[in-house]
Amino acid sequence: MFWRLRARLSYAVARRLMGWPWMVRQPRSWAWMQGQFSRMAALGDVGAQSFYGHLLLFRGQGFGAREEGLRLLRLAAAAGDHKAAYQVGVQALKGDTRHAADAREAARYWGQAAEAGHPLAARKLGELYRSGGPGLEPDDAQAERYETRARQLGL
């Protein structure tokens, strides 16, 4: 019980320290902060999984950082985090050297994010359905539906 409280408090302090650029530039403090993000994500906190997944995806160092970031983002998306779902959709459509671009998977994640209220996901999904993509045929009805949803959400 005590270790969970300690993990939450340490995570809150680490998130607060992210606002201080000079602290992020210090190797020891950065390593400590990453440890707190990792521990909280490993405990199953959806917000921490999303945050640390984004951090590893865009700023991670090492061979496995990108894959670990995507794994954490997928876990957060499965738990309902719309920002993580949007980013997993972007990465699915982009593809990489080991995985081909998959528009169907991108549409699934963007659909989840759009239904949760992510306006950019709705717009991108409308564009994807309008033009089609790798493994996804164009569908004007779905495109219109998601373009309308994007307008409702403010885009």
Predicted regions and their residues:
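Inter-repeat boundary and helix-capping residues of tandem alpha-helical solenoids
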Residues: 3, 26, 30, 42, ...
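Alpha-helical segment of the N-proximal tetratricopeptide repeat
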Residues: 9-28, 32, 36-39, 43, ...
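Short helix-capping/linker turns of helical repeat alpha-solenoids
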Residues: 10, 43-46, 58-60, 79-82, ...
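Hydrophobic face of amphipathic alpha-helices that form TPR/SEL1-like repeat modules
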Residues: 15-21, 51-58, 87-95, 124-131
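Structural signature of tandem alpha-helical TPR/SEL1-like repeats
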Residues: 25-36, 61-72, 98-109, 136-147
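Canonical positions in the second alpha-helix
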Residues: 38-40, 74-76, 111-113, 149-150
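TPR/TPR-like (Sel1-like) alpha-helical repeat modules
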Residues: 104, 108-115, 123-130, 137-155
